[in-house]
Amino acid sequence: MILGIESSCDDSSVALIDEETLEQIYYKKISQEEEHAIFGGVVPELAARLHTKALPALLNDILLNLKDINAIAVTNEPGLSVSLIGGVSMAKALSIALNIPLIAVNHLVGHIYSLFLDREATFPLGVLLVSGGHTMILEINENGEILELASTSDDSFGESFDKVAKMLDLGYPGGTVVQENALLCEDKDRFKFTVPLLHDKRLEYSFSGLKNQVRVEISKLKTITQKDIADICYAFENTACEHILNKLEKVFKLRNFKRFGVVGGASANLNLRKRLEVLCQKNVCELLLAPLEFCSDNALMIARAGREKYFKKEFINHSELTINPRVGFKKFEI
């Protein structure tokens, strides 16, 4: 079995998978959303303290399975440094105690493998990665090498939802609550936001301007009613999704994708999923979607990504395993 450990942000998660059959032996995640909600976002120091409690508790659940573990896969990049260190420290200690190999997993690569939790990975593949920390269009070639085609210059897709939710006092995280309120909209033409970089040829995303447009409209309201909230959420969500699709259409003209995947916590947005289905049908491209319950951070995807390295014997020494809060991929240049 392969043990997966995830602690890159505010989710503590542990998973066990069979490296031969991909059977999920154990999976559990402890979310910190409730603890961070009162602050309107993730507080790194609090996240670190909560990981120190949650990870040992999760490990305790699988004590009887430790003798059957053949390798440990752990997220070491990118993420919050104080969060990453919790998972990496536990992985190192277990690896030494059990005398089994250690595998370093890039968190973003883990998200890509959320598309293949129950099957073999097949490349080449185009991927849209949308989360609270990242917005990227990636290309993975036949050898599994990753090229970044586009990314955001400021806020991420998911982060913009969190910030709009905070402006409207809807709580944290914002993705689900903004989507739910958007569905209550009765006047779809009331607010019109400009799609960022609409006529800009650069393969780049930017959500800060859209966020400011929302702030301006909110400031014009003397009091904010439920109808106001629903109408604003609808206009914002639609514009944010349109921004994603606008750049994707440009990428599809440059790359003849036959298969395209969508991953990351924000990929659970139903509006975005529907638009991507239309885009892929238009381009005769197979759309791969991560299961809704595994869009957000989880240890299953880390174990799954680690399994690929396990068979290639891409292990890492304890002394060489470090955390890298910020890390990217090779960038595409037009």
UniProtKB/Swiss-Prot annotation:
Cofactor: Fe(2+)
InterPro entries per the UniProt record, alphabetical: ATPase_NBD, Gcp-like_dom, KAE1/TsaD, Peptidase_M22_CS, TsaD
GO biological process: tRNA threonylcarbamoyladenosine modification
UniProt entry tagged with the keyword tRNA processing: yes
SUPFAM superfamilies: Actin-like ATPase domain
Catalytic activity as recorded in UniProt: L-threonylcarbamoyladenylate + adenosine(37) in tRNA = N(6)-L-threonylcarbamoyladenosine(37) in tRNA + AMP + H(+)
UniProt keyword annotations, A-Z: Acyltransferase, Cytoplasm, Iron, Metal-binding, Transferase, tRNA processing
E.C. designation(s): 2.3.1.234
Places the protein is found: Cytoplasm
Entry GO MF terms: iron ion binding; N(6)-L-threonylcarbamoyladenine synthase activity
Keyword Acyltransferase among record annotations: yes
Domain of life of the organism encoding this protein: Bacteria
A cellular-component GO term for this protein: cytoplasm
Binding site for substrate: L129, V130, S131, G132, G133, D162, G175, N269
Binding site for Fe cation: H107, H111, D297
Cofactor annotation remark: Binds 1 Fe(2+) ion per subunit.
Enzyme class name: transferase
The protein's role, per its UniProt record: Required for the formation of a threonylcarbamoyl group on adenosine at position 37 (t(6)A37) in tRNAs that read codons beginning with adenine. Is involved in the transfer of the threonylcarbamoyl moiety of threonylcarbamoyl-AMP (TC-AMP) to the N6 group of A37, together with TsaE and TsaB. TsaD likely plays a direct catalytic role in this reaction.
Record-stated family: Belongs to the KAE1 / TsaD family.
Protein's name according to its UniProt entry: tRNA N6-adenosine threonylcarbamoyltransferase
